[in-house]
Amino acid sequence: MAAAYPWTLFLGMLVMVSGTMGAALRKPVDVAFGRNYVPTWAFDHIKYFNGGNEIQLHLDKYTGTGFQSKGSYLFGHFSMQMKLVPGDSAGTVTAFYLSSQNSEHDEIDFEFLGNRTGQPYILQTNVFTGGKGDREQRIYLWFDPTKEFHYYSVLWNMYMIVFLVDDVPIRVFKNCKDLGVKFPFNQPMKIYSSLWNADDWATRGGLEKTDWSKAPFIASYRSFHIDGCEASVEAKFCATQGARWWDQKEFQDLDAFQYRRLSWVRQKYTIYNYCTDRSRYPSMPPECKRDRDI
């Protein structure tokens, strides 16, 4: 699948054109790790560089590691730059996600599934609402995510959740409460990232196992941007709801250009979409038509 990596002329044209959600997203603010995040486990497997502006997560046969945000948030724009585990990364998973803290939790997931050397990474996204997930989408990326840092971002407001890679929307999940589909709106979420061994499922359904002779596996991070409405975990609303930039009209839907970008990702790089899986869902889930993500 080497063809999944090269930049195409079409993408080059897209990048030169400006526009996201009818208006540009606020540019991420590059801040050090310690400004917004703390380690959560295996502290000795996190390495710090450039005064904490860049970190590495290390995975070996004994443990992986991870970190989480200091605060909990209801809505906002969250991003970080990541460079994934290079070489033979089969069996490893690098995750960047938002999650609340109870049994009926909400969750917004980026999961990067490692692969054998020369085979492309798979990016899996998922959305959990009220404890229910099963909304997986999988894509290849149009570049090698192990060579350089790239931005991975989530825009979350009362109207939709947008997953972005270098400002290209790869997925949208609309608020479809009127269709009986739960939407994350009242459970503050922390932001997490981790690197761990998942060779029971991550690569070819668990057929490819982690080669520990290649350890340590290293994922790199920088630009730990959070622009969100911070709340206590007991809060059921955001005190500034409606007043933040992400609440404004131009961020309530993708614009035509953004839908063209999303369609390009769907047509060129999507390898699985729950919306089109009739074996799992004989009837299309109601949110899929509204998301225009089919």
Swiss-Prot record:
Enzyme Commission numbers on file: 2.4.1.207
GO biological process, one term: cell wall organization
Localization per Swiss-Prot or TrEMBL: Secreted, Cell wall; Secreted, Extracellular space, Apoplast; Cytoplasm
Keyword ATP-binding attached: no
Modification after translation (UniProt): Contains at least one intrachain disulfide bond essential for its enzymatic activity. N-glycosylated. Contains N-acetylglucosamine and mannose. Glycosylation is not essential for its catalytic activity.
Protein name: Xyloglucan endotransglucosylase protein 34
Glycosylation sites recorded in the entry for this protein: N115
